[in-house]
């Protein structure tokens, strides 16, 4: 990572917290501690290196994940599947040095997702910054950070990975930021039914406010039976699993319609968790099961689809 590509970014508010940050804090995902985490940041560019071409001091930006920019995946606009994704986002230090963070003689891990945005200042490459243009110039910049991870994961899964079509039914499992972003995207795509399964009553209410047509309390209702009831025995055409719970994923498969498509974005609490999937069920129903990272998004998607939709009032901050 050439030093000339680096830039300094001044954050105007605290970065948002993602479950990935919490997973590292709790030891679920490996990352050397102590560390400065954070990867849903937004702010104002303060200074740029001589190699920066498209950004200047004063520009408002959203920070997203890092990628190498030159492997086969990156060249085909699939940077979330960068062949060097681990090193780019979880290496804890810049590849070219020097050490960015320290306390006394102790080195502090940083450069998390190419940014470490839980700080007043952060260093990032131009490649993983998205300039906020006039389409959202009236939106508080501190609300735009999730566009770089949570929102693009949920919305991208709907618009890119699943390519959800109008008039179809869509099931969201988990009503957090990712799931609610998927709800808004499904509404934008014109889904006839948007069903959200979420144990929190407050989140179920929020899902309805953002476009869900029905909600399910999985703690007190049978998920598969309710989906079949709502869809008149057809099952759902599309589903997005956001919880990371194996049992929920298995129920999602049982809730699918013929030729249904299920995308999985939730990381399980135990990384070695496995799900019981019947090959016969997949064959008989013609199901498609896919894993998705960052909503298959790239910088182009983040800067156009999400921001334009935000201007139209489709994407609202799930406060």
UniProtKB/Swiss-Prot annotation:
<feature type="binding site">
    <location>
        <position position="68"/>
    </location>
    <ligand>
        <name>Zn(2+) 2</name>
    </ligand>
</feature>
<feature type="binding site">
    <location>
        <position position="18"/>
    </location>
    <ligand>
        <name>Zn(2+) 1</name>
    </ligand>
</feature>
<feature type="binding site">
    <location>
        <position position="82"/>
    </location>
    <ligand>
        <name>Zn(2+) 2</name>
    </ligand>
</feature>
<dbReference type="InterPro" id="IPR013149">
    <property type="entry name" value="ADH-like_C"/>
</dbReference>
<dbReference type="GO" id="GO:0046294">
    <property type="term" value="P:formaldehyde catabolic process"/>
</dbReference>
<dbReference type="GO" id="GO:0051903">
    <property type="term" value="F:S-(hydroxymethyl)glutathione dehydrogenase [NAD(P)+] activity"/>
</dbReference>
<keyword id="KW-0520">NAD</keyword>
<dbReference type="InterPro" id="IPR002328">
    <property type="entry name" value="ADH_Zn_CS"/>
</dbReference>
<feature type="binding site">
    <location>
        <position position="149"/>
    </location>
    <ligand>
        <name>Zn(2+) 1</name>
    </ligand>
</feature>
<dbReference type="InterPro" id="IPR011032">
    <property type="entry name" value="GroES-like_sf"/>
</dbReference>
<protein>
    <recommendedName>
        <fullName>Probable alcohol dehydrogenase</fullName>
        <ecNumber>1.1.1.1</ecNumber>
    </recommendedName>
</protein>
<dbReference type="GO" id="GO:0005829">
    <property type="term" value="C:cytosol"/>
</dbReference>
<dbReference type="InterPro" id="IPR013154">
    <property type="entry name" value="ADH-like_N"/>
</dbReference>
<comment type="similarity">
    <text>Belongs to the zinc-containing alcohol dehydrogenase family.</text>
</comment>
<keyword id="KW-0862">Zinc</keyword>
<feature type="binding site">
    <location>
        <position position="71"/>
    </location>
    <ligand>
        <name>Zn(2+) 2</name>
    </ligand>
</feature>
<dbReference type="Pfam" id="PF00107">
    <property type="entry name" value="ADH_zinc_N"/>
</dbReference>
<keyword id="KW-0560">Oxidoreductase</keyword>
<dbReference type="InterPro" id="IPR036291">
    <property type="entry name" value="NAD(P)-bd_dom_sf"/>
</dbReference>
<dbReference type="Pfam" id="PF08240">
    <property type="entry name" value="ADH_N"/>
</dbReference>
<dbReference type="GO" id="GO:0004022">
    <property type="term" value="F:alcohol dehydrogenase (NAD+) activity"/>
</dbReference>
<keyword id="KW-0479">Metal-binding</keyword>
<feature type="binding site">
    <location>
        <position position="74"/>
    </location>
    <ligand>
        <name>Zn(2+) 2</name>
    </ligand>
</feature>
<feature type="binding site">
    <location>
        <position position="39"/>
    </location>
    <ligand>
        <name>Zn(2+) 1</name>
    </ligand>
</feature>
<dbReference type="GO" id="GO:0008270">
    <property type="term" value="F:zinc ion binding"/>
</dbReference>
């Amino acid at each position: 990572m050439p030093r000339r590509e680096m830039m300094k970014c001044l954050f105007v508010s605290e970065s948002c917290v993602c479950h990935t940050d919490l997973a590292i804090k709790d030891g679920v995902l490996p990352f050397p501690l102590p560390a400065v985490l954070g990867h849903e940041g937004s702010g104002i560019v303060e200074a740029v290196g001589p190699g920066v071409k498209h950004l200047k001091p004063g520009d408002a930006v959203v920070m997203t994940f890092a990628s190498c920019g030159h492997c086969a995946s990156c060249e085909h606009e699939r940077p979330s599947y960068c062949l060097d994704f681990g090193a780019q986002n979880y290496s804890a230090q810049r590849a070219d040095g020097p050490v960015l963070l320290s306390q006394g003689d102790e080195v502090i891990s940083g450069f998390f997702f190419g940014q470490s945005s839980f700080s007043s200042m952060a260093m990032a490459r131009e490649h993983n910054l998205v300039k906020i243009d006039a389409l959202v110039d009236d939106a508080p910049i501190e609300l735009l950070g999730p566009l770089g991870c949570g929102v693009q994961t949920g919305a991208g899964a709907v618009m890119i990975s699943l390519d959800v079509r109008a008039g179809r039914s869509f099931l969201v499992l988990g009503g957090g930021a990712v799931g609610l972003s998927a709800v808004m995207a499904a509404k934008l795509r014109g889904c006839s039914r948007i069903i959200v399964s979420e144990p929190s009553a407050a989140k179920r209410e929020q899902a309805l406010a953002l476009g869900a047509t029905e909600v399910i309390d999985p703690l007190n209702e049978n998920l598969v039976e309710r989906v079949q009831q709502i869809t008149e025995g057809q099952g759902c055409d599309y589903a997005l699993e956001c919880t990371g719970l194996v049992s929920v994923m298995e129920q999602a498969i049982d809730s699918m319609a013929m030729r249904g498509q299920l995308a999985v974005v939730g990381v399980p609490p135990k990384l070695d968790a496995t799900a019981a999937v019947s090959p016969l069920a997949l064959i008989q129903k013609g199901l498609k099961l896919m894993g998705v990272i960052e909503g298959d998004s790239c910088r182009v998607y983040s800067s156009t689809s999400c921001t334009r939709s935000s201007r139209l009032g489709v994407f609202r901050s799930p406060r």
